Amino acid sequence: MRKFVAFFVIVALAALLAGCGGQGEQEQKPSEQKTTTTVAESKGIETLSDLYNSKKMVHGTAKVTLQGETTTVEFWYYFDMPNKETLLRYEGEQGGMGKMTAIIKNKYSGTTLTQTMYMKSEKMEAQGCDWIVITQTSTISQSESNIGDEPVEDAFKSTFASQGNVWEYEVETVDYNPSLFQPDGKVCQFSYGS
């Protein structure tokens, strides 16, 4: 389920940003290269709970293919254990959109997953918004809701390495910085049909 949601978010983000910039739809071509990984080891940090208890977050770079275009993104990933929420921020160039930033918050409550996605690009600033926010709620199984024991590497892999969109990534653990996961400036609500 998390892989599907992550894939949906990346595709929705790319489609939304392309739509905001007046870009036409492009067919996404599957990656012909294999995903390779480099993971920096951190002693004692194996699960998302360990990440929270150590006051650390994952920081890295990844080569991502969106709408047939390959770009390098920088990302940060954190698990807020008391709130049962994963936080992801990534930044990179996106074709005609220029620099793009996204903050994705996945909050788990029982069998409900609430995903809040904030998106920012140079093109949106011309529309009077610093950020656009989209919120989506879905039902998940109770086992999917228990994420604290999930291995850190699996957590960010399921966020990024879905459907062959990521070719390679490199990560390390760094001190947690909460300001990275808060949008600054004017936030506009984006509505879409169900």
From Swiss-Prot:
Keywords: Signal
Signal sequence, renumbered to the chain: 1-24
Top-level division of the source organism's lineage: Archaea
Protein name: Uncharacterized protein AF_1001
